[in-house]
């Protein structure tokens, strides 16, 4: 099995697995909600056809190319996706997640993230990063609960929404090398700084 084949993972409450075309109604429900997608780098889908295109471009292609882990987050009791958690295969090893609103505040993103982190450690990844919009501190609290630490903030002109966004980068070192910081976003951004009150 290739390192970047999305595996199936289980936790106490959750089943993490690849999305399939049978999940398109759930894909639509997750990615059509404006509030769920408010801080994400895409516009909400408006039709089932857009949901299918979104699935093909962002999920099926990653499964085919083995370029990232892209999990559907499902409750074990019904195996219906209520969100997603991803880990990129590039050098950022970026962790991302999102949930339908009715599943917020239940610790599900943290539980799913912990499972992905365990799998990443077993696979030998040295570190993971994650970023969140400064206007979305809820996501930063998930990162902190996952054991990640804040490293720096940077500004990016976010596409396709074409808006300036301040992001905070968090990092988790899985190999014990805590002095290392993933610097790509810092180096690429003309506006970067450390928010002392977060450290």
Name what the model sees in each region.
Residues 1-38, 70-199:
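Acyl-donor (CoA/ACP) binding surface of acyl/acetyltransferases
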């Amino acid at each position: 099995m290739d390192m970047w084949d999305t595996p199936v993972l289980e936790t106490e409450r959750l089943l993490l697995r690849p999305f399939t075309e049978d999940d398109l109604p759930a894909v639509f429900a997750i990615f059509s909600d404006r509030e769920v997608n408010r801080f994400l780098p895409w516009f909400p889908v408006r039709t089932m056809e857009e949901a299918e295109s979104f699935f093909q471009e962002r999920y099926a292609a990653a499964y085919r190319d083995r370029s990232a882990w892209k999990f559907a987050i499902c409750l074990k009791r019904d195996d219906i996706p209520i969100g997603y958690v991803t880990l990129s295969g590039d050098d950022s090893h970026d962790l991302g997640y999102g949930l339908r609103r009715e599943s917020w505040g239940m610790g599900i993103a943290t539980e799913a993230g912990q499972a992905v982190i365990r799998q990443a450690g077993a696979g030998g990844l040295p570190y993971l990063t994650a970023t969140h919009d400064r206007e979305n501190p809820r996501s930063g609290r998930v990162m902190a609960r996952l054991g990640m630490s804040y490293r720096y903030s940077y500004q990016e002109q976010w596409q396709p929404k074409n808006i300036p966004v301040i992001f905070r980068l968090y990092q988790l070192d899985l190999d014990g090398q805590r002095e290392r910081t993933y610097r790509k976003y810092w180096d690429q951004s003309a506006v970067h700084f450390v928010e002392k009150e977060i450290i």
